[in-house]
């Protein structure tokens, strides 16, 4: 019979093999980005000493005491030379919390810090918190904006599913100690808010996503833009929709900003998610657009369709057919690390460059919003290529 110590050694050996496994780029890409063979974080990547009581007296059978279900939707930042993710970790009890995982190279060897983040509560405590967007703002703080979920107080008796969503705000300078600021005041529910990294006209700028309910965007028109005077008492008084939803597109049901945009010489690069309905439920994909440096509310490029969709094993998980990203890192040499979750279950990385992503945005045809328009766009490319091939 295997002893407690032998089983414990096996647990740690298997864990160390997992977190030190070298990731491998997949070379069958589309020229825009490169996927990698292995997920960078799964529930199994959470430390053994989080999940198991290692005391042979209190846990003689070495049972898992605190189960972890998923690692997903992670904010990202380059910090002191390391690639940091503020990971949404979901426990077996369905509660999410934040934990920092760091890597020396951004593609593998991600290791969780010993303790998860202790996030201070708002005046009204939240039941669940998740999906943090990180922004190193020019005011000197790193802000994390995330969704705070609470049971809807207006729900009928017995309705234990209705919820409300607010944009919670916290800031830090070391990722250990966080200052919780009041939730964003808005005229609608908000679960998808991102802070622009620079002041605009002396104010803080937010990308928003107004919606009528906890899930449904309803009358919310798309990705919004708002200016606020003070992040310590942030209030949206006026919103402008800068990236609209459209019928029969990848973003007809709803869309939302992912991480904060990347500044390039030709404009701001944006990564977002789009949602449409299908027979299998809601399908989440990733898409890009660009806005002007002089006027960040003006869209200057909007490629048709998705840049990234679920493939292979990415399509299966707790919420299948979903890709979601709220974190990317642009290195000094122009390399871009795109961190995305698949099917609300695991984290992946894809790499590209600023030059490639700008080229993709500026030179990919826009959506014509009809089958006939799509055919005409395709015919133009076919004619050009046939001429080159002749």
Task: Enumerate the predicted regions with their spans.
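Well-ordered alpha/beta subsegment
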Residues: 312, 329-334
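Beta-rich carbohydrate-recognition and catalytic domains
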Residues: 1-73, 77-127, 136-194, 198-253, ...
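Extended, compositionally biased non-globular segments
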Residues: 323-327
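Active-site/ligand-binding surface loops and adjacent short beta/alpha elements
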Residues: 260
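Short, surface-exposed ligand- or partner-binding patches at beta-edge/loop junctions that are enriched
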Residues: 337
């Amino acid at each position: 019979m295997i002893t407690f110590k032998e089983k414990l050694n096996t647990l740690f050996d298997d864990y160390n093999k997992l977190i030190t496994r070298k990731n491998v780029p997949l070379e069958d890409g589309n020229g825009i980005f490169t996927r990698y063979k292995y997920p960078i974080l799964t529930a199994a990547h959470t430390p053994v000493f989080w999940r198991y009581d290692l005391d042979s007296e209190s846990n003689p059978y070495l049972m898992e005491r605190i189960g972890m279900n998923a690692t997903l939707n992670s904010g990202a930042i380059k910090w002191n030379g390391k690639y940091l993710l503020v990971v949404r970790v979901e426990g077996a009890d369905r509660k999410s919390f934040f934990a920092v995982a760091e890597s020396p190279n951004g593609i593998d060897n991600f290791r969780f810090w010993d303790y998860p983040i202790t996030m201070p509560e708002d005046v009204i405590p939240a039941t669940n918190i998740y999906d943090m967007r990180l922004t190193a703002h020019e005011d000197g703080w790193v802000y994390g904006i995330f969704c705070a979920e609470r049971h809807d107080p207006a729900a009928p008796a017995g309705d234990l599913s209705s919820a409300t969503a607010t944009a919670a705000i916290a800031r830090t300078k070391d990722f250990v100690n966080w200052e919780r600021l009041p939730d964003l005041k808005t005229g609608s529910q908000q679960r998808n808010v991102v802070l622009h990294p620079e002041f605009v006209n002396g104010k803080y700028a937010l990308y928003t996503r107004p919606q009528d309910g906890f899930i449904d965007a309803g009358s919310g028109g798309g990705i919004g833009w708002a200016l606020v005077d003070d992040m310590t008492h942030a209030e949206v008084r006026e919103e402008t929709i800068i990236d609209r939803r459209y019928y029969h597109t990848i973003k007809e049901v709803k869309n939302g900003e992912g991480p904060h945009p990347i500044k390039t010489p030709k404009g701001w690069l944006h990564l977002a998610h789009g949602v449409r309905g299908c027979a299998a439920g809601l399908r989440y994909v990733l898409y890009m657009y660009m806005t002007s440096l002089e006027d960040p509310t003006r869209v200057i490029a909007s490629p048709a369709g998705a840049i990234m969709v679920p493939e292979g094993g990415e399509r299966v998980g707790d919420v299948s057919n979903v890709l979601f990203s709220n974190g990317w890192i642009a290195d000094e040499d122009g390399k871009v690390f795109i961190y995305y979750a698949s099917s609300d279950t695991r984290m992946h990385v894809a790499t590209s460059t600023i030059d490639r992503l700008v080229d993709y945005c500026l030179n990919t045809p826009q959506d014509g919003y009809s089958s006939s328009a799509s055919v005409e766009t395709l015919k133009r490319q076919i004619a050009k290529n046939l001429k080159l091939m002749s």
